A protein has these predicted regions:
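Catalytic cores of alpha/beta
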Residues: 3-14, 62-77
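Short amphipathic alpha-helical interaction segments
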Residues: 37-41, 58-62, 72, 79, ...
């Protein structure tokens, strides 16, 4: 879902138990002048989702560089979907080392 706080209540009304925040806009804004504005949008959406009783997931274009800030700033993210970046990194560093590094990055951000 796009980071629109008002839509979290709508998602909850459908009977959903979780939402996945679509993070490509965050990834594009990462390390730019728009970064803090975008991070706050996601944080507000996550707070709204939690207030509506929803769990929060996130995914799309997350990677080892932009993931720590996202997890530190956006409350309650229970799960992230990182397919492309993880596999691309694994081709260079190996799957086991890459998974360990992502777990370290996520642990550092928690």
């Amino acid at each position: 879902m796009d980071p629109l706080p008002e839509m979290m209540v709508v998602a909850a009304a459908t009977g959903a138990q979780r939402v996945e925040l679509y993070t490509e806009p965050y990834a594009r804004a990462f390390a730019t002048a728009n970064e803090s504005t975008m991070v706050e949008r996601y944080a507000a959406a996550a707070r709204s989702a939690q207030a509506a009783g929803l769990g929060v997931n996130a995914g799309h274009d997350l990677n080892r560089d932009n993931l720590p800030l996202f997890l530190a700033a956006v409350p309650g993210v229970a799960e992230v979907s990182i397919g492309h970046a993880l596999i691309a990194d694994a081709l260079e560093w190996g799957l086991a080392a890459t998974v360990r590094d992502y777990l370290r990055v996520m642990g550092d951000a928690a």
